[in-house]
Curated annotation (Swiss-Prot):
UniProt feature, compositional bias: Low complexity: 21-42
Gene name of the encoded protein: QWRF3
PANTHER family: AUGMIN FAMILY MEMBER, QWRF MOTIF PROTEIN (DUF566)-RELATED
Name the UniProt record assigns to this protein: QWRF motif-containing protein 3
Family: Belongs to the QWRF family.
Polar residues bias: start-end ranges: 191-219
InterPro entries, per the entry: QWRF
Chain span(s) of sequence motif QWRF motif: 292-295
The species this protein was found in: Arabidopsis thaliana (Mouse-ear cress)
């Protein structure tokens, strides 16, 4: 690789000398067709790559806060526009993309002076290679490592620092036609000479990127490591041609700022270092991954919520079905109990059917026996028994019965007459019965008292006898003493 680069440098330097020799000649119309062809090719490539840039999410003309441009996605490829207007004045020291002159130091890329049209071709090739990367996942690591090594080699090539006063001196002299024509011819020749070497190198990078097209899905995933850096186009090591007059002065300024760039830690107070651009690019990648992970987490949360709601619905449906099954089981149990009771009742009825069938045969005999009992009771109550051949005179019996009926009628009439008086006598009789009961109780008490009185009389008599005996004894003793 190093030998190929040295050969390319040698060939390009030789061609740059030829351009410097042509720079001294009068302006010709041969440079303008080349320029037009390059712009037309670049416009076609730009149209073809619009879809690729939209797919890769590249941001065009994104500027930092200090006024410099930072490329996201593909360094040295963020802007592919070329000025196609012929009336605009080209400048070999200021790129068409960076058409803003910054105060103080101005960072100019070494490759920007030589390739304007060839960059568009290289960008189209790289975009195609990155589009092919989205088809596979296995070779992304190898591609990222090779491209990171290339980029590390390219990052060691800082741009040429030009002071603002030289740029003012150059832009302050637009009236000199010779300088304009020389600069245009020099720019066109340098672009045409440097296109071949860059295309060869881009073909090698394209082969590497096509080999790494099987890991694009893994590479584009949020979990990809930060080591995979963006692909950049290698800048050539060519130097701008050394012209006469103002060119020598500019070359002296280039050498001065180049030596100062090697000694100073910062290339420019306005334009950040390559590490700053890399850190900004990594920050964008990390932000992109963070957004992707947030989207993934939000989608996962949404999916979890949907799954939870579905599970809840399923649980509710299962709970409802279980309740229905419990109700069905209870209903079946109730039906089973009813059937068991019906079977028991049928068994009892079947056990009594034989007796009922036997009762149908016994019912006639039972009715006949009941009729006989009724007749016998009637004869006992309403008929006189005649035994041992007794005979009755019917006339006398009838007269006696009539007299008995008349007596019973008289008794009934007297009872009816005394019935209201008996209604008043009944409570008196009840009261009299109560008085009689109380009288019996009092009589019993009197009997007890009389018995006690008799006992007390006996005791009184015995006491009197004892008292008399004692009195007599005392009297006798007194007499004996006297």
């Amino acid at each position: 690789m190093k030998s190929c680069e040295h050969e390319l440098l040698k060939t390009r330097r030789g061609k740059s000398r030829e351009v410097s020799s042509r720079f001294l000649s009068s302006p010709s119309a041969s440079s303008s067709p080349n320029r037009r062809n390059s712009t037309s090719n670049s416009s076609r490539d730009d149209q073809n790559n619009n879809g690729v840039k939209g797919h890769l999410g590249l941001k065009k003309h994104d500027r930092m806060s200090d006024g410099t441009r930072v490329c996201f996605g593909l360094p040295n490829q963020s802007s592919i526009e070329v000025d196609t207007k012929e009336n605009r004045m080209p400048s070999p020291w200021i790129n068409d993309e960076d058409n803003v002159i910054l105060p103080g130091r101005f960072s100019v890329d070494e490759c920007a002076l030589y390739r304007a049209s060839s960059r568009r071709n290289s960008c189209s090739l790289l975009y195609e290679s990155f589009n092919d990367e989205t088809d596979s996942e296995l070779s992304d690591v190898s591609c990222a490592s090779s491209l990171s090594t290339n980029r590390s080699s390219w990052n060691h090539k800082p741009g040429i620092k030009v002071s603002s006063k030289y740029l003012h001196d150059l832009t302050a002299k637009p009236s000199k036609g010779n300088n304009k024509t020389k600069l245009r011819s020099q720019d066109d020749s340098q672009r045409t000479n440097s296109s071949k070497g860059i295309e060869n190198r881009l073909q090698r990078n394209n082969s590497v990127s096509r080999y790494g097209s099987s890991m694009s899905q893994w590479a584009l995933s949020p979990g990809r490591s930060l080591d995979t850096q963006a692909v950049t186009v290698p800048s050539s090591k060519l130097k701008p041609p050394r012209g006469k007059g103002v060119g020598k002065l500019i070359n002296l300024g280039f050498d001065f700022f180049r030596s100062k760039n090697k000694s100073s830690p910062f290339t420019s107070p306005l334009k950040p270092k390559t590490c700053d651009t890399e850190s900004a690019h990594q920050l964008k990648l990390m932000n992109n991954r963070l957004l992707q992970w947030r989207f993934v987490n939000a989608r996962a949360c949404d999916v979890n919520k949907n799954v939870a709601s579905q599970e809840k619905n399923q649980l509710l449906c299962a709970w409802d079905t279980l309740i229905k099954l419990n109700n069905l089981v209870l209903q079946e149990r109730i039906k089973l109990q009813k059937k068991n009771l019906e079977m028991k009742l049928n068994y009892v009825f079947l056990s009594q059917v034989k007796h009922l069938e036997a009762w149908e045969d016994m019912e006639i005999q039972h009715l006949s026996s009941l009729s006989i009992i009724r007749d016998s009771l009637h004869s006992v109550l309403s008929r006189l028994p005649l035994k041992e051949g007794a005979k009755v005179n019917l006339e006398s019996a009838v007269s006696i019965i009539k007299n008995a009926e008349a007596v019973t009628d008289a008794i009934i009439s007297t009872v009816d007459d005394y019935a209201p008086t008996m209604e008043g006598i009944v409570p008196l009789a009840s009261q009299l019965a109560e008085v009689v009961v109380q009288e019996k109780l009092m009589l019993e008490k009197c009997h007890d008292l009389l018995r006690m009185i008799s006992e007390l009389e006996m005791q009184e008599r015995s006491l009197k006898c004892c008292f008399l005996i004692q009195h007599k004894q005392t009297f006798d003793t007194n007499l004996l003493k006297h």
